[in-house]
Amino acid sequence: MDLKQKYIFIEGTNCPVTVRGRLLQVFRRSVSGELFKGLWLVLREMLRFNIHTTQYPKEKLPLSPRYRAIHELLRLLESGNERCIGCGLCEKICISNCIRMETSYGEDGRKKVHEYTINFGRCIFCGFCAEVCPELAIVHGGRYENASEQRAHFGLKEDMLTPMERFMNQGQKEFPGFGALSQDADSKVKKTPLAYFTPKGEENV
């Protein structure tokens, strides 16, 4: 077995160093037609009105249920109470160590969450906190338009928890699950035709 490697020497083009040489290089490339080919391609597509640009913010692309944006704390649909039971699993599994919560036991003996904060300066949006939550209390929402002076404006409990007014107006969207498909998933999947012939020679699809 021959273990010797064979190297091939490729002669590279010498880049011009002087100003005159660079100007000549630009002139040669312009005359050769590379510049005009690109301009003609842009002009042709513009005249055909073959535009694929999304006119944001008037037009917005649909987001997949698996999209991981700013976190949201959900409420129970039956009573409107907070779903979070203060188990602390999200705080323990967070690999960025950016989740903090303060809990205590109330008069009814149930654990209550007083403070729940996420440091979005360290969060990498891995989604582990949402996956491990047994009550689907913390999920990743679709809110990606987050213009603010500080990241802390989105990481407090009162910012992430569904407001009661919006909840009463049925404004809380249920989390479809990590395996959920997008609404237009069928149009994006290339379907393979399953055509075969029966013994009688009739074609079935």
From Swiss-Prot:
Keyword Cytoplasm set for record: no
Species, as recorded: Wolinella succinogenes (strain ATCC 29543 / DSM 1740 / CCUG 13145 / JCM 31913 / LMG 7466 / NCTC 11488 / FDC 602W) (Vibrio succinogenes)
This protein's name: NADH-quinone oxidoreductase subunit I
Cofactors (names): [4Fe-4S] cluster
Group of enzyme by EC: translocase
Cofactor mode of binding and number, as noted: Binds 2 [4Fe-4S] clusters per subunit.
Stored HAMAP family: NDH1_NuoI
Pfam families: Fer4_7
Gene name of this polypeptide: nuoI
Domain annotation 4Fe-4S ferredoxin-type: ranges: 75-104, 114-143
Binding-site residues, [4Fe-4S] cluster 1: C84, C87, C90, C133
GO CC, alphabetical: plasma membrane
Assembly, per entry: NDH-1 is composed of 14 different subunits. Subunits NuoA, H, J, K, L, M, N constitute the membrane sector of the complex.
Residues passing through the membrane, by range: none
EC number: 7.1.1.-
Family annotation (PANTHER family): NADH DEHYDROGENASE [UBIQUINONE] IRON-SULFUR PROTEIN 8, MITOCHONDRIAL, NADH DEHYDROGENASE UBIQUINONE IRON-SULFUR PROTEIN 8, MITOCHONDRIAL
Purpose: NDH-1 shuttles electrons from NADH, via FMN and iron-sulfur (Fe-S) centers, to quinones in the respiratory chain. The immediate electron acceptor for the enzyme in this species is believed to be ubiquinone. Couples the redox reaction to proton translocation (for every two electrons transferred, four hydrogen ions are translocated across the cytoplasmic membrane), and thus conserves the redox energy in a proton gradient.
GO BP terms, alphabetized: aerobic respiration
Top-level division of the source organism's lineage: Bacteria
Family per similarity comment: Belongs to the complex I 23 kDa subunit family.
Protein keywords: 4Fe-4S, Cell inner membrane, Cell membrane, Iron, Iron-sulfur, Membrane, Metal-binding, NAD, Quinone, Repeat, Translocase, Ubiquinone
Catalytic activity: a quinone + NADH + 5 H(+)(in) = a quinol + NAD(+) + 4 H(+)(out)
Upper classification of the organism: Bacteria, Pseudomonadati, Campylobacterota, Epsilonproteobacteria, Campylobacterales
A GO term for molecular function: NADH:ubiquinone reductase (non-electrogenic) activity
Topology with respect to the bilayer: Peripheral membrane protein
Binding positions ([4Fe-4S] cluster 2): C94, C123, C126, C129
